[in-house]
């Protein structure tokens, strides 16, 4: 009789333990009902990017010294830098700079190691196109600021402010 009572006690303890585990899982599930949804409705809502987001690369032609550090640190040798040596001033003159975003892995090495800070990451992440050749950006396309920067409140205030002329 004693082994039978011990068996029922073990069965009861196992049942209570199982009910406790099920209750813990149920409480975790209920705690998720109070959270805000993470999903966004993409075409109608835009993703809020973090400060360190690595989007499209912005290029400033005037700052570039054609040192090709960006090409050397790129894991896939992506930036194409065309330059000409000016013998009279003994400096390189940048002719063309382009990046193909169809191949770019957005690692950020080019931005990090650029000695003149002519490269920077933007918040732009929408690159959809029907032709992959449209993803090859030259220095003119890389120099354009993304719309999120143009729509910034401070930029709009500066653009809309009346300019005073000192007479």
Curated annotation (Swiss-Prot):
Catalytic activity: a plastoquinone + NADH + (n+1) H(+)(in) = a plastoquinol + NAD(+) + n H(+)(out); a plastoquinone + NADPH + (n+1) H(+)(in) = a plastoquinol + NADP(+) + n H(+)(out)
Presence of the UniProt keyword ATP-binding in the record: no
Keywords: 4Fe-4S, Chloroplast, Iron, Iron-sulfur, Membrane, Metal-binding, NAD, NADP, Plastid, Plastoquinone, Quinone, Repeat, Thylakoid, Translocase
Localisation: Plastid, Chloroplast thylakoid membrane
Described purpose of this protein according to its UniProt entry: NDH shuttles electrons from NAD(P)H:plastoquinone, via FMN and iron-sulfur (Fe-S) centers, to quinones in the photosynthetic chain and possibly in a chloroplast respiratory chain. The immediate electron acceptor for the enzyme in this species is believed to be plastoquinone. Couples the redox reaction to proton translocation, and thus conserves the redox energy in a proton gradient.
Gene: ndhI
Main location (coarse class): plastid
Family: Belongs to the complex I 23 kDa subunit family.
Cofactor(s) this protein requires: [4Fe-4S] cluster
Name under which the protein is recorded: NAD(P)H-quinone oxidoreductase subunit I, chloroplastic
List of residues binding [4Fe-4S] cluster 2: 74, 104, 107, 110
UniProt xrefs under Pfam families: Fer4_9 (PF13187)
PANTHER family, alphabetized: NAD(P)H-QUINONE OXIDOREDUCTASE SUBUNIT I, CHLOROPLASTIC
Keyword Transferase tagged: no
Alphabetical list of InterPro entries matching this protein: 4Fe4S_Fe-S-bd, 4Fe4S_Fe_S_CS, NADH_quinone_OxRdtase_chainI, NDHI
Organism: Barbarea verna (Land cress)
Subunit structure: NDH is composed of at least 16 different subunits, 5 of which are encoded in the nucleus.
Enzyme Commission (EC) number: 7.1.1.-
Transmembrane segments: none
GO molecular function terms attached to this record: 4 iron, 4 sulfur cluster binding; iron ion binding; NADH dehydrogenase (ubiquinone) activity; quinone binding
PROSITE patterns xref list: 4FE4S_FER_1 (PS00198), 4FE4S_FER_2 (PS51379)
An annotated GO BP: photosynthesis, light reaction
One cellular component (GO) term of this entry: chloroplast thylakoid membrane
Cofactor note: Binds 2 [4Fe-4S] clusters per subunit.
Binding-site positions, [4Fe-4S] cluster 1: 64, 67, 70, 114
Domain 4Fe-4S ferredoxin-type: 55-84, 95-124
């Amino acid at each position: 009789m004693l082994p039978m009572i011990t068996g029922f006690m073990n069965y009861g303890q196992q049942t209570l333990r199982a009910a406790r585990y099920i209750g813990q899982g149920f409480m975790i599930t209920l705690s998720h009902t109070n959270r805000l949804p993470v999903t966004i409705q993409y075409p109608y809502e835009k993703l809020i990017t973090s400060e360190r987001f690595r989007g499209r690369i912005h290029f400033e032609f005037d700052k570039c010294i054609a040192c090709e550090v960006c090409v050397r640190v790129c894991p896939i040798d992506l930036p194409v830098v065309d330059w000409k040596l000016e013998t009279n001033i003994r400096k390189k003159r940048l002719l063309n700079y382009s990046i193909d975003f169809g191949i770019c892995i957005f690692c950020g090495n080019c931005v990090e190691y650029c000695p003149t800070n002519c490269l920077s990451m933007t918040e732009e992440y929408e690159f959809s196109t029907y032709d992959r050749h449209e993803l090859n950006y030259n220095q003119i396309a890389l120099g354009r600021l993304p719309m999120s920067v143009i729509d910034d409140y401070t930029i709009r205030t500066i653009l809309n402010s009346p300019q005073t002329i000192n007479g």
